[in-house]
Amino acid sequence: MWSDPIADMLTRIRNANMVFKEYTDIPASNLKRKICEILKREGFIADYKYIEDGKQGILRVYLKYKGGRKNRERVIHGIVRVSHAGRRVYVDKDHIPKVKNGLGIAILTTSKGVLTDKEARQLGVGGEVIAYVW
C-alpha cells in the first residue's frame, strides 16, 4: 500500500475548504511547511503554525475566505497533486506550466528549494511539479 503525505495534505486542505472550516491540522514535515509558506505568501491561506506534539508535530493551516458570513466565497477554487509516486512529472526551465493562464500557481521542487512557477522562471530552473493551486 502506497502513502503520499503531500497528496494527503492537499486533500485535507481541499476538504476543509469545501465545508468552510476555519482551519485544518496536518502532520508536519519540512516539505509541507515550505508548501504552506508558498500558499501563505501567494494569498491562498490566511496563516499556518507549527504545533509541537512530542512526535513529528502538527501544521495547523488557517484557511482564507472572501466576503462575510452569509456570502462567503472560497479563495482556493482548486488544488491538485500533479507528480505522485506512480508518475513523476519533471519540467525544464523552458516548459514550466502556467496554471489558469497565470491566475493560479504551480508549486515545484527544484535544486533551489520549493518554488512557485513564477520564481522558477525568474531563476531559470526546472524541477518536479508538486501541485497546481488556483
From Swiss-Prot:
- Keyword Flavoprotein in annotation: no
Listed under GO cellular component are:
ribonucleoprotein complex; ribosome
Q: Name one GO biological process term.
A: translation
Q: Which residues form a coiled coil?
A: none
One GO molecular function term of this record is: rRNA binding
Keywords (alphabetical) are: Ribonucleoprotein, Ribosomal protein, RNA-binding, rRNA-binding
Kindly state the subunit structure of this protein.
Answer: Part of the 30S ribosomal subunit. Contacts proteins S5 and S12.
Q: What does this protein do?
A: One of the primary rRNA binding proteins, it binds directly to 16S rRNA central domain where it helps coordinate assembly of the platform of the 30S subunit.
Family annotation (HAMAP family): Ribosomal_uS8_B
Q: Which family does it belong to?
A: Belongs to the universal ribosomal protein uS8 family.
Put simply, this protein is called Small ribosomal subunit protein uS8
Q: Organism source for this protein?
A: Thermotoga neapolitana (strain ATCC 49049 / DSM 4359 / NBRC 107923 / NS-E)
